[in-house]
Amino acid sequence: MTLRRVLTALVALILAPRRHRRRRPDTPPIGREHYEPTVLAADAASTQVSSDSIPVATTPKGGWGEAWPAPVLAGCDEPLADEAPDLRGVWKVVDGPFVGHIERIEQAGQRVVITATGIIHDMVADGTLERGVNDVDPTGGAVSVAARFNDGRLDLFPNNMRRAVVTRYLDGDEMVWRYGPYRNRLRRLEAPTDGVQTELLKEADDV
């Protein structure tokens, strides 16, 4: 890990909310397959499709554009790792610097796939860089991130830093996403139109 890579990562982290405000608003994926994860097997012995049998997904050159890519782990029924929180679903930030951000989280075994803002970050939460995220960030810059499950959290360690820089965990029916110094609360969407009417009413009240 070089000092230059660390500084680059920190600058990108600090400027992330500004970039978020400048880009087009996120739109939720269309299709029930995004909102209804595969039913998982009762135990490892009953697994029909393991997470390791599915090729690692990567961000396409230039990002995936406006149409959400198909779920990566569709059909994978390997039970979640014992220490893993169940973060599966489509989530939208309702409070925090990244309000409006939408992301889809898939899980099976130790594997986690987070799709959002044009990127696909596919990882195995075993604490290694080799099986972590080796891809690009929303700006196109290269990233290398180790992932681990700790005390009900998904912790991410860019360049295998000692402390987690990004964390996701459940808080009741909501998810908390800490991105560096920024804390966001997310609500799970049940359909593409979930929350749209509420937002329209809020906009009308603000006029």
Question: Predicted segment positions?
Answer:
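N-terminal glycine/threonine-rich, aromatic-flanked beta-hairpin/loop signature
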Residues: 52, 97-142
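Short, surface-exposed beta-strand-loop junctions and turns on beta-sheet-rich folds
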Residues: 119-122, 161-164, 183-185
